[in-house]
């Protein structure tokens, strides 16, 4: 597995930071009907059981917000990806269907409340560190303008920052040419809750993305 560590700066600011990691080979393609139906089922369940005002109190979302706030980020203006996905679903806007990898990200976020990110390892340069981005740091977002990642717990390689619980960079995004990925589950309540989630994520990657050569670890 690619070398991944958590910076002392992040650990000092949020001691319960833990990163669930799955590295594997995959086949990127449009999502199957089975995966789409599974997502539709989960979306219906959420719409029947939650209201928008309750999203920020969901345990994993609340922990992500608490960490980002502790690092100095305005969590009302900059929502984490799981929170934003929940809001979109409860507003009846559905989700964006991009490819099976992106949809597995959505599946895991919607069933757990954890923010996730998946990265094309062929575009990641060298070792990875989960760190706190400094004030004023930006990177080109995926199909969007530059993203302000200052004061966020963000992944960086030997070139620059490329991912965080809010929004990922265009540089390392998954495309139809991607074969080797790193999927990360951003945890802020210690390693223990990630164990079961990683198991379910691995099953989903194998079922929907034909994942192979899989390595799983938790960095805390």
Language model features with spans:
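Charge-biased, low-complexity intrinsically disordered regions
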Residues: 1-220
